[in-house]
């Protein structure tokens, strides 16, 4: 039975690496996975999922206005899809998460979503909020803070490396702008 999975974590826990390994596993068995990534995330170029360890694979792009149900049902009608892999799923809209549940429930295709749970303010992204509510399986991928504890928060830094508490929820950046830390060091960095 197909299910929807949400693999979530702070930054630098290996979400994209895990997605690419899943894609490889499907292809190794002669199956066809389809990978999507957010068009807004162009850190490593467009139309690619890339991991920090050097793996990468081409991906379909999605943006907030895309109807993923229509897109995937047409793709599936053209050539059978065995699995849908979504990178940067925190950028999905509520409606897109619902559309992905339709892919699972009506087309019987597993959907594996990988993304951040919360932003630099400690607030849920919309995509993450609805995946936490509607996914069949929730899987936390772990990374570590500089102190050795589990990192479950993300700090956004300015150019001088100081923690920022305000700003737009979405600002694309990598290790130069964001650091994963434990809750204790998150609060300390923000002076709370």
Curated annotation (Swiss-Prot):
Subcellular location: Cytoplasm
SUPFAM superfamilies recorded: Glucocorticoid receptor-like (DNA-binding domain) (SSF57716), P-loop containing nucleoside triphosphate hydrolases (SSF52540)
GO BP, one annotated term: thymidine metabolic process
Reaction(s) catalysed by this chain's protein: thymidine + ATP = dTMP + ADP + H(+)
Annotated positions binding Zn(2+): 145, 147, 182, 185
GO molecular function: ATP binding; thymidine kinase activity; zinc ion binding
Subunit structure comment from the entry: Homotetramer.
Name of the featured protein: Thymidine kinase
Organism, as annotated: Photobacterium profundum (strain SS9)
Lineage: Bacteria, Pseudomonadati, Pseudomonadota, Gammaproteobacteria, Vibrionales
